[in-house]
């Protein structure tokens, strides 16, 4: 809370460059940033605006990608493709979503033909309903199995924090909450290490009566950003970057 999507993206880009001091910001050849709801503080071509706000020279171009759940992945593969064909040597790819500021579907106006002509089913417009249809199609994916997967995911995440495996990829960011005021966020929003099967079993299924999708076994509504530095092998070796 109390943050902007573009500022979250700026924090990620600046943190990325701080961790790679051998990279001259002026050498960045492109910035591809994904966002699903491209409006408000994550509109205005978020790739270009985040590049400028991050302090990159105005000679560095940027563009935005809208591919919903696969947006940031598409940013990475698009930049990787540009590098593989020789269009770029070094560039930044990432994504941002501030679901606290922009609930899913905010400001959208789906064409009536989608439903009138049965181009898609009505429940295709809501991800939770789509998830219920997946349970219908694959009956072996029971609610108990989904709950157990969710619980194990939470437990593995908690252990990864204890082992220090996640912190190296995080960038501390200022955030504000009604309870604590301004704080520094050092942990992702999603982890709930106290998750139990009993607790998950008691959650409501908001997308269908007696359904299988709950707030505990589905994707969270989070605010966050990510950025990655991509380079050709030759450029990485030239700059002495660690190839991952």
Task: Label each PLM-derived region with a short phrase.
Residues 85, 89-137:
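Flexible glycine-/small-residue-enriched beta->alpha junction loops
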Residues 65-96, 135, 139-166, 227-237:
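Active-site-proximal alpha-helical scaffold in enzymes
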């Amino acid at each position: 809370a109390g943050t902007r999507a573009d500022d979250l993206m700026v924090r990620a880009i600046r943190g990325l460059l701080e961790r790679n001091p051998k990279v001259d910001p002026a050498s960045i050849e492109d910035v591809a940033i994904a966002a699903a709801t491209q409006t408000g503080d994550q509109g205005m071509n978020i790739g270009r605006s985040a590049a400028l706000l991050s302090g990159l020279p105005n000679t560095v171009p940027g563009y935005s990608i809208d591919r919903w759940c696969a947006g940031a992945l598409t940013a990475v593969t698009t930049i990787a493709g540009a590098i593989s064909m020789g269009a770029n040597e070094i560039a930044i790819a990432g994504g941002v979503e501030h679901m606290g500021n922009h609930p899913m579907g905010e400001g959208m106006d789906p064409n009536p033909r989608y439903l009138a002509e049965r181009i898609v089913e009505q429940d295709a417009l809501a991800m939770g309903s789509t998830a219920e249809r997946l349970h219908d199609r694959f009956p072996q994916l029971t609610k108990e199995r989904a709950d157990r997967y969710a619980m194990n995911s939470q437990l593995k995440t908690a252990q990864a924090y204890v082992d220090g495996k996640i912190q190296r990829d995080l960038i501390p960011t200022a955030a504000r909450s009604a309870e604590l005021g301004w704080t520094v966020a050092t942990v992702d929003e999603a982890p709930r290490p106290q998750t139990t099967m009993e607790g998950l079993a008691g959650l409501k299924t908001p997308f269908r009566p007696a359904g299988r999708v709950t707030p505990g076994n589905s994707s969270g509504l989070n605010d966050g950003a990510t950025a990655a530095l991509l380079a050709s092998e030759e450029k990485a070796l030239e700059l002495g970057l660690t190839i991952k």
